[in-house]
């Protein structure tokens, strides 16, 4: 089809003097139109111009048939008065332009999720949005994919590069629609250009080769730039000089009333691009919550994903680990808040690290306080320990001299300046105090067992052993029993001096 003239909807130009349309893969492209409008329509056009206003450029052939050649949204409108006439200039961009405005953060962790589903989620945020993957749509992501401080347009282009291919906006339809990859058509339209230019971009080939783009040869860096009045679309397959090419770029200009087009042609392999990564994610971390723990790996629910499920098992960072199995093993629990850290541009290299201290919840603090209170009544010694050193998890965070390990079941190890305290949270504790010595308190039995000797010696004072009902000392068949009423000694021989 040849365009003998063009029309712009919903605007009515009395005469169009300039029109430039640019379309390109991996780019939004744009259209600019300039022409005369009726003076009495100035205010109406200024009023109707708004964000997301759809504008369509149609080509009309010699028999009056009309086809939309560019459909997008109004980006800019300017009206100039000159010698009692009105000249209006407009700029139109495709709907995919809306995808390139706001950086976003989200993740896709389900390793079985196909790439087409990833793009479906992205495009669901746009009215009339849709993405058709001609390449790789059924492939599973296999590893986490994280969109970090990227616009949706940048993210889609990066996903496309995983398959060494390009993104093409739908320039002729309403809504944010795009295509990933090119389609090999059963037949190619033959081009008979008025003139053409050949260019070989050797540096482009070298760049792709050094970045591990497979399936290309040096001739794939050959470009043909041809002029033709026939209308073709970006990504369309054409035949030129007995070879098949694809259109990488279209530039259309108005010459009088007719539209002339300049096409950039490449081989199918010439469209291949190196795999791209998001360098912005290097050194970044995302907040989340532990959902599952297994051995030394965890699953996380990231805050940026809302209710989306967690799938990938991530390593958990530790202060020390060795291949021989030695090291520090202290895993978080489900519900703990953490950060997912990315040391490189590859999401699969991410690992979970600890989070900043958070305020102790009322439930947790209350349970800890209650546990301490119940233990405080057991003995006077225990009361002293409790009053001086609260076992509430929040209390130790107020004193930097305390190094504390506290579990959700109220188990605690407290390393202070003058003492070490081990507390089970159930009425049993051991305290080693620089000033007061060692205190062992237990709500259950205390057992000391040794395969060899046990020595109890007091060099500076007395050794006191007390029992509520009795104290028994046994050795083989000999026994001494001390009760409130009697001292009973039994054995083969008993000597009292």
Name every feature range the model reports, one short phrase each.
Residues 1-497:
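Amphipathic alpha-helical and helix-coil boundary elements used as assembly
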């Amino acid at each position: 089809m040849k365009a003998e003239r063009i029309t712009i909807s919903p605007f009515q130009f009395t005469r169009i003097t300039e029109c430039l349309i640019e379309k390109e893969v991996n780019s939004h492209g744009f259209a600019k139109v300039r022409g005369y409008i009726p003076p009495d329509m100035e205010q109406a056009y200024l009023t109707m111009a708004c964000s997301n206003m759809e504008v369509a450029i149609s080509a009309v052939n010699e028999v009056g048939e009309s086809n939309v050649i560019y459909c997008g949204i109004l980006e800019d409108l300017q009206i100039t008065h000159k010698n009692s006439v009105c000249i209006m200039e407009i700029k139109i961009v495709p709907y995919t332009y809306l995808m390139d405005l706001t950086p976003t953060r989200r993740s896709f962790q389900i390793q079985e999720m196909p790439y087409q589903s990833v793009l479906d989620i992205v495009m669901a945020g746009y009215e009339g949005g849709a993405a058709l993957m001609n390449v790789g749509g059924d492939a599973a992501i296999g590893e986490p994919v994280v969109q970090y401080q990227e616009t949706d347009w940048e993210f889609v282009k990066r996903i496309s590069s995983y398959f060494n291919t390009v993104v093409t906006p739908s320039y002729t339809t309403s809504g944010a629609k795009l295509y990933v990859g090119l389609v090999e058509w059963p037949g190619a339209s033959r081009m008979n250009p008025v003139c053409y230019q050949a260019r070989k971009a050797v540096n482009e080939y070298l760049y792709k080769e050094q970045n591990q783009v497979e399936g290309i040869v040096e001739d794939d860096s050959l470009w043909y730039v041809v002029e033709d009045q026939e209308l073709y679309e970006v990504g369309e397959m054409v035949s030129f000089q007995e070879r098949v090419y694809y259109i990488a770029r279209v530039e259309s200009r108005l010459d009088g009333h007719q539209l002339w087009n300049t096409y950039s042609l490449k081989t199918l392999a010439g469209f291949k691009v190196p795999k791209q990564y998001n360098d912005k994610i290097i050194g970044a971390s995302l907040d989340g919550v532990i959902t599952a723990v297994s051995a030394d790996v965890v699953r996380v629910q990231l805050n940026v994903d809302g209710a989306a499920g967690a799938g990938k098992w991530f390593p958990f960072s530790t202060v020390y680990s060795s291949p021989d199995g030695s090291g520090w093993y202290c895993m978080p629990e489900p519900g703990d808040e953490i950060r997912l850290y990315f040391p490189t541009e590859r999401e699969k290299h991410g690992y979970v690290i600890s989070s900043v201290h958070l305020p102790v919840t009322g439930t947790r603090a209350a349970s800890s306080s209650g546990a301490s209170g119940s233990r405080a009544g057991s003995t006077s010694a225990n009361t002293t320990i409790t009053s001086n050193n609260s076992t509430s998890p929040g209390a130790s965070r107020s004193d930097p001299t305390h190094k504390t390990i506290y579990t959700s079941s109220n188990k605690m190890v407290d390393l202070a300046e003058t003492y070490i305290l081990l507390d089970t949270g159930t009425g049993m504790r051991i305290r080693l105090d620089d000033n007061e010595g060692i205190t062992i308190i237990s709500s259950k039995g205390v057992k000391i067992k040794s395969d060899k000797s046990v020595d109890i010696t007091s060099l500076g004072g007395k050794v006191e052993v007390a029992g509520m009902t009795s104290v028994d000392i046994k050795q083989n068949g000999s026994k001494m029993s001390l009760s409130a009423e009697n001292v009973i000694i039994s054995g083969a021989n008993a000597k009292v001096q």
